[in-house]
Regions:
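Transmembrane alpha-helices
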Residues: 54, 117, 150-182, 205, ...
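Loop-to-helix entry region at the N-terminal start of transmembrane alpha-helices
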Residues: 41-52, 101-122, 206, 210
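Cytoplasmic-entry segments and transmembrane alpha-helices of multi-pass inner-membrane transporters
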Residues: 67-100, 125-132
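Hydrophobic transmembrane alpha-helices
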Residues: 84-91, 100-103, 113-127, 182, ...
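Short cytoplasmic-facing helical segments at TM-TM junctions of multi-pass membrane proteins
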Residues: 126-165, 171, 195
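Periplasmic/extracellular loop-to-transmembrane helix junction in inner-membrane transport proteins
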Residues: 8-56
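C-terminal transmembrane helix and the adjacent membrane-cytosol boundary/short C-terminal tail
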Residues: 75, 132, 209-243
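Alpha-helical membrane-interface segments at transmembrane helix boundaries
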Residues: 39-51, 82-88, 101, 105, ...
Length: 243
């Protein structure tokens, strides 16, 4: 009896809402679907992307900072490290990731080695340049105050080099965020995973959403670094106001 009633009324089509209708039509960007699926589909990828970027930047900064200090003290060390890091930087990203797979396997290790390698040249150059551009007057004043070479480095030279160092961190951060997206070509991690998946399936919303999230992540990171820079270098603002 119930079957007869439903047959007379015609087929029953569930109401999926505007988001699902947009997805069925493969709209360019379905906002409702994105908001409904952000927590499950995209937020874990955002966290992975942040982790990939943060780990690479932390390791790259430690290596580059130490190398810059050595090169600042022993100038003959500058050229070999600069050439090595420049060699890493010139390797195409996808090729670098593929080269690492037979060596360290598919996963975080291969991606992090490649990402760290791309940060070295930028961070090393900016740190060393910042130290080399410290005015001689500042060094002489520190020496006149009785500071040792190590004390002068920590209290005078490094603080004056902070703007150049952070400028390098800004560039390295944005670069790493973009390269971490390409890393999903090797293994599905970060925001590159939904991007490459959407390319294969033709899912417009997933592609646009993941791309916009990667762009937003880079912009937010850049703003945060600028705020940190201003907090660490108040004398730069005071100097610009005086000028």
């Amino acid at each position: 009896m119930i079957a007869v009633v439903f047959a007379q009324q015609g087929p029953v089509i569930p109401n999926f809402g505007r988001g699902d209708e947009c997805i069925r039509n493969n709209g360019r960007f379905c906002l409702h679907w994105f908001l409904d699926n952000f927590g499950d589909r995209f937020w874990p990828r955002v966290v992975e992307h942040i982790e990939l970027t943060a780990i690479a930047l932390a390791i790259g900064f430690v290596i580059s900072f130490a190398a810059a200090l050595i090169a600042y003290r022993y100038t003959r060390f500058e050229l070999p490290f600069a050439n090595l890091s420049a060699l890493f930087y010139t390797v195409p990203s996808i090729a670098f990731f593929q080269i690492m797979v037979p060596i360290t396997g598919i996963g975080w290790t291969s991606i992090e080695i490649a990402l760290v390698s791309y940060t070295l040249l930028i961070l090393f150059r900016n740190t060393l340049t910042g130290l080399q551009e410290v005015p001689d007057e500042a060094k002489e004043a520190a020496e006149g105050m009785g500071l040792t070479r190590a004390q002068s480095l920590v209290r005078v030279e490094l603080p004056l080099a902070v703007p150049a160092i952070i400028a390098g961190v800004r560039v390295a951060t944005v670069t790493t965020i973009s390269l971490a997206t390409i890393a999903a070509f090797i293994t599905p991690l970060g925001l590159g995973a939904p991007i490459f998946s959407a390319i294969q399936t033709g899912a417009n919303t997933a592609f646009v959403a993941a791309s916009l999230l990667a762009i937003a992540l880079a912009l937010i990171a850049d703003v945060v670094i600028v705020v940190v820079q201003r907090a660490l270098t108040p004398w730069v603002r005071a100097r610009s106001r005086a000028a």
